[in-house]
């Protein structure tokens, strides 16, 4: 076999789930107390529905999300004044007036994105005896192998357990509450939300919550009727208890009370009126409450064991495709390193040195001790936790994983919880293919398709270009134009191009020719068409991007001022090379190498401005030798790391793939 030859290997996507029973160990994230903040709660999800389990004892909050709950409505992502503004910015860049170009770039901005919303909370209240629970008996865990959040504690001689999972087959969040003594389970349950909503009891054992998202990200201070109609939603909570033992009472038409049961089962279903990125909520024909009740009806003949078995069959088919083990003895505390034990003394009461410490040591303490014991099993856990999160927030037919996956507890979350295209969205899906979760990437492909629809209008009107374009941030409505804000992140028309590299990668892993021909290639064609029109010839004959930014980064211009707009950032050039490589390679597979577009891409690729190296040999972010980077605002400014990384990512891939040209 010659270097660079292709080798046909078995399609791992169809592999049978296997776990090495001899060396595998429980993959669990463990806690020894209730969550004190939202980020300490346990995330569960089925791709569409998400929940955060706090693990409170006398009172509990299970925070809920549904992936289509966003503010806003479909919008127009074009600006007929942009071509004139683009010409002005380009002239300023050509004349070396980078500060002025940065200021003038504001005329290329569009509106900001809409905002991902929360669904609400399940609120559980137990009687006062639970205030006296035994802290030593408390245990909360996320079992990655079963995608189940569990809670266990004792009150006197009664042990209470709660189990939580989000079923994809039945589209329901399931919670089971049990006590070790007959008739020991008593509590009240209600639903609540920060969104406009109302609740009522249905049939004596169900709570229905109906509400709506704002029609605009910041609701105007006008009469409610003047506010555009936003996405409507409904959540249905069904309550079941043990046969013949215990009763359910209705309190104030919004709360249910359970008294003296052996166990209780809560089923949470939710739906919204969202139909597509191109359908106004006011035009939706979906009835969220009817849909939720219909989904509940489909579970009528399923016991808890049935629901759990169906959940496991679905989830483990994905999760157990990959096992990851760094060393066979990773489940034991190192016995011959006194320094390790000495530094673990603060945790000594929680560590059973003769057994498997992962069953008793809270994960946060394992993280703290990692600097001393370098426990490889913690790395294994982190790896699988990443796979768990992707499975939980991105499934076929769901929305794309946003900035926080699917979990959010605020009406005004950081960065709108929006899909951020300048690295965050790509990072969400980097594990999908290498970690054998190709199905979980399907929402990303669907999202790219929606972006291409709106992006073709933005490209044509704003930039007088063919094909389609997307910028640094989007939302459920597939926003494709630049956002309001700072040019260093808003003015970046490479978002769609970078996403398209995932399409070629998907084919490389799956060898799905039908996908390549009917889904990936048309999107790559549109992306390549835009890139070719966006490139302009520079003074030295290179094809350049102008204006150009290196996302979220600035430089000190020759006039001594901070600027961010210039030409041909290394990131732009790296992404464009990736796109050209992808479509040229795809055309060879599909026998389209002679197409006009492919010939244009082949001709343009060697004319792209080459990567610039600084005097110390480092890769420069911009093609300008006479500028410098401002120091970070704070020494711990880790966000600076994501910008150079995006540039380097392409060069690393070029070095790894036979036949690829280096920049």
What is each stretch, according to the model?
Residues 512, 521, 539-542:
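Loop/turn elements at helix/coil->beta-strand transitions in domains of secreted/extracellular proteins
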Residues 424, 492-506, 519-533:
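Extended, hydrophobic alpha-helical segments in both membrane/secreted and soluble proteins
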Residues 6-487, 505-507, 525-528, 542-543, ...:
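Aromatic-residue-lined binding/catalytic grooves and analogous aromatic/hydrophobic interfacial grooves
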Residues 490, 512-515, 633:
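Short, contiguous acidic/charged loop-to-helix segments that flank catalytic cores in large enzymes
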Residues 147, 495-502, 527, 575, ...:
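Amphipathic, well-ordered alpha-helical segments in soluble domains
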Residues 373-380, 422, 497, 514, ...:
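Soluble non-cytosolic domains of exported or imported proteins
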Residues 526-586:
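Acidic/histidine-rich catalytic neighborhood
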